Amino acid sequence: MKNNLLFDFTVDKAAKTVYITREFDADLSLVWDAFTKPEILDRWVAPKPYVAKTKFMDFKVGGRRFYAMVSPEGNESWLIQKYTSISPKTNFKLFNAFADKDANPQLPGSDWDYSFSEQNGRTKVNITIYNESLSRMEKMIEMGFTEGMSVTLKSLDDLLSTLSQK
């Protein structure tokens, strides 16, 4: 059933942009919730063996999500996101940056644009990530961003399969 699900990851260095397209075998409402509800996000958004821990999240325009990716040894890497646009079950945009433990952003950051569409019971998510700095984007990719996104989206796929059965 999960065979032939679309996954595309493209890096455009000239535009300082990463384009990700991923298809999920789940309805749009469930996929939207998986990207917008902290209790679901924390179950998949960190690449294993890391876990995500949301300290606070206010999913509204101008709202923020502050969370950590926690290593098995307990080391925390904090991130802050600010929601800049929300069109329910269609699109949302945010600014993302690493942060210190007090939610102070460490710039430069990146602008993320998520678009959702559903066809025949499958949901396609298009993610466009514009980086303020080419060197930041190159460093993220060097640190394993491509592999990390692939692993986390696979974790989401597995989680959606479990949640769909409920």
Task: Label each residue range with its predicted role.
Residues 22, 54-57, 79-85, 110-117:
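Hydrophobic/aromatic beta-strand elements that line small-molecule binding cavities or substrate pockets
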Residues 19, 39-76:
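Short beta-edge strand/loop motif at the mouth of beta-sheet-based domains
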Residues 15-17, 95, 101-147:
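Beta-strand/loop substructures that line and gate deep hydrophobic ligand-binding cavities in soluble
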Residues 4, 37-38, 62-66, 94-100:
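Short Pro/Gly-enriched beta-strand edge/turn motifs at strand-loop
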Residues 1-3, 132-166:
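A conserved amphipathic terminal alpha-helix motif
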Residues 1-51:
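Hydrophobic ligand-binding cavity/cleft-lining segments
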Residues 28-29, 58-60, 84-91, 115-124:
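A short, structured loop/turn motif at beta-sheet edges
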Residues 31, 41, 65, 83, ...:
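Hydrophobic pocket/interface hotspot
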